[in-house]
């Protein structure tokens, strides 16, 4: 076995050594444009710098006619003024509000009031007396209402929806602010016109309602113990750097006193072409597209951008643990300050993390998680430009203190520093990163973000490309020296304990009034975009007979095949048409595959071998299906298949391991009482299905404790005796793949009948109902549910149109009303969900996360949208155009083809239903959609489920929305 590993490592090192000559920076030119590239770059990326300093980075990928776009600014929260933190994040929000050419029906008239609003804010920020501040804010609200008569909300969202963009969003972090879209390739001209105008002269309109959304975002962070720990850790690690001195969302006192003039000043200083980049990954012609970028963004003028001066951080004299209090589960976090991405030894920082924890065979994986020493432990590396942070986290199991968890984690740091790990782990980490990169660079989104990182962190892309090679060549002694040098007293310890947080200060809701949306108004700029003539993309749908090859491995065991023509990676899945609804013990049984070994190998040795092969196997028990997945490079395919198959057929369950696992499950269930998301899910299940639902019918604590090793072993050993399908996606042909799988994947002659999934029927309420569960939090989480109709494939186009128009995105009437007009939430959406199989029912679902003091307004507003769907022919036609544009340019690729086929079969669809959506969407009329809303949503009694604090919410007053029932945690979990 050792000889096999050494041979494999030698071959990989030889191939990588030859590749080490690659990644050299080169220059070339085409059609008058000079660009740089790197030899051997799998993304074939090119980097151009235009005359005005604008960077353009391009990577062509013709797998599908779409382009992933990023417009990046090398300015984030690090660049915020110390007395005005949060500006970068504010500005990111305002870049969706338009310019003097769109987002307005009459900018000259609007500007008069916008100037008044800006002056009022400047005055507001100077006044300290609360009564005076309320008077001024009332004036801001009043003038904003007048200004809003001339604004047109969401025109940016309407335009990108119109061109078929998906994933429209933006984010702000320490070093960057980035604006993203995934667009059809035939809409590149329209997208460039939209974006060049967007950045030309942004107008800070509809500010006070957007400010409310930022307040909501801040209050959400106050309910999130992870966020609080993260902020405290960075503040402790960085006493001189803005990483620790300020946060991206900003300080509460600064958020309460926003300055529009300071935001504009930030824009003028940082949003300049020599500080920005356009990154494109997808289907386009580089030279043609570059000429268009130059034409559209040539107006931008280069300006000097001052670099921040860095003050070195000091090594700590002593480590003083910090305590953070909150309602959620207890955990300990340890953070180490390391050199940043620009360091020539960044690859060693990555290696430190991978040797510590890689989810398979790291020190934490083998010494802690596999032995179940704590409830859960992990490590990750947060890569930043100036300093990385290596973060370790641990959750205690029953009877364990946070200090004990800390000691267990620190023991792994000591093992790293003193070289108590297998040297193979280093080369295997490099091999695994190489394989992961190969997979990532085949995807346009992952490629775009990799190229984005190289720009904003100011490192050559070749540096990231070379990291797997550098890692594999690293000697153990060098990594140990690096660990001893870096893992000294430069760390922080945060104990997150349960208790009432008396430090965090919630931002109180200011008194504001809804602003008009002017949905049916349209600016000339937007009309021109929508009227643009384009060359249509020809849609491409899956042919279930031609695109998927089918064969039999045995009786009632079909293999589904689609080839990987992109690289040498494979994915193998065993899919069973039953899940935890059929057998509540399945998730526990399959978990043992990760924790126990066989008569030949221990679990730790199995994990090491999988990692050495750069293969991962995952087990997943969903509600109605079960999956066993194996993936990795084709060169190690046979060995990986043989190991996995032997493990399943010969698993030896250790009694102590089973007992520890059961105790951990019991602890996780206890922790759910302090997890608002778990509470929300459980309450939603209760509201949807009643007292007997997927949460309350889980295996009970008593049954858990009665589980025996024999039960688990038999369940796993017999798994392949049940009917299942084998899904193969990889570089081999069907005959080759099948013959190798058959060699190891032997199926018993005596077959078992597959267990039947339990059916949970939704409740059709005869009257409106409200369920409430108490949890101490600043926010309130509100869900709406109602039972839908049985599955009908003929309604698929209609449901697509309804969701796109009603509540699926930022251009929807639901989002516009709840967030843009009334500023009631940061996150909100609504949609009609189709069932997962042909015999179950659909479901209408809506969600609003809001401040507790806005709960009444939120419920009233959503109920109004449920009773009456707002009418806008403009938005309706826009929604239909978006759907057809996406359907034409969307491509289902790789193993997703096989899973889409199985999903279609469960719904009794014999062909790719996207064909109907593409062809029939434009035939749908507004009255048809209105009738769907009336019959499937308005006509149904809604059940509202609320998670919030009874100290902040008057539960007695909720009866105006329906019959109120307060449910305890015991009732909704029922363990």
Task: Briefly describe each language-model feature range.
Residues 188-190, 286-290, 344, 400-404, ...:
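Short, conserved charged micro-motifs
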Residues 197-204, 296-304, 410-421, 646-655, ...:
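A common structural junction motif
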